[in-house]
Every structure is written in structure tokens, then in C-alpha cells.
Amino acid sequence: MSISSHDVGRTYPTTDPYLVTAEKIRELATALGDNAPAYRGDDPIAPPTFAMVLASRAWEALFDDEQLDLRLEHMIHTDQSFHWIRPLHEGDEVTAALTITSVRTRGNTDIIGINVSLDHVDGEHLGNATSTLWHTRPEGNA
């Protein structure tokens, strides 16, 4: 079996909470080469792309779903956007839940839209990470 438009709306279980720490914020800012003071100091906020640290944990459920037959080595991440309600702060505990929002098939390529909802453990919605993935099925699986 492989992914199809019938999978649109499929939502995976929420990830375990991730504790945002000043150290992790600084590590990402350093990796990005961004020395903005907002990402350092006593009360740092996370760079907007910190969403991918959280979203990638939710992606694991998608790739582990044997019914979809998605293979990471056949995947290209083609588009990404973030919509934040508020920045992440040190001490935030955040969960992520992935939903398949679209699937289009062209030949042996599946174009998959996903949305990862990012929420504080207290229920506050923090933002979304939206992605488009291109998955090419091996020959014979089209």
C-alpha cells in the first residue's frame, strides 16, 4: 500500500512534550550564524526556524507509518512555512501533532502537504509548521 488522497486528514498522535531551554535556543542560533541578542541572554526567544526542531519529531510518525510506504531516501523537502502566534521562550513545553493536508500523485511521484500543529502543554496553540514533500516511489510501485 502507498500514500494516496484517501490519507488526507490523517493525524498522528501528539509527540511527547519538548522542553525549550536557553541552551537549545543558543545552539540553533549559533548553527544558523545568527548573533541576534534576542536569542541570547537572560530571557531568550527561539528563532522562528526552531519549529523544525519540534516538527521533525512529529515527522517520525509519518515516516514510521508502514501503511504509507514512504522512504526517506526517496523524499525531497520542497517547501516550508511557519506561522507563529507567539515566540517560544525558555521553559515552554511544546508538543507537535502532524496532519496530512494534501496528496497529489503524478506518475511515480507523490506530492504531500503536511501541517504540524505546535501547542504548549497547557493547551495554548503556539503556531504551525507547514511543509510540502515530494516522494518518488521506486520503479514498479507507481
From Swiss-Prot:
* Entry similarity comment: Belongs to the UPF0336 family.
From which lineage does this chain's organism come?
Bacteria, Bacillati, Actinomycetota, Actinomycetes, Propionibacteriales
Matching entries from HAMAP family are given as:
UPF0336
CDD domains in the record: R_hydratase_like
Domain of life, source organism: Bacteria
Q: Write down the SUPFAM superfamilies for this protein, in alphabetical order.
A: Thioesterase/thiol ester dehydrase-isomerase (SSF54637)
Q: What is this protein called?
A: UPF0336 protein PPA1896
Task: Note the Gene3D superfamilies from the entry.
Answer: Hotdog Thioesterase (3.10.129.10)
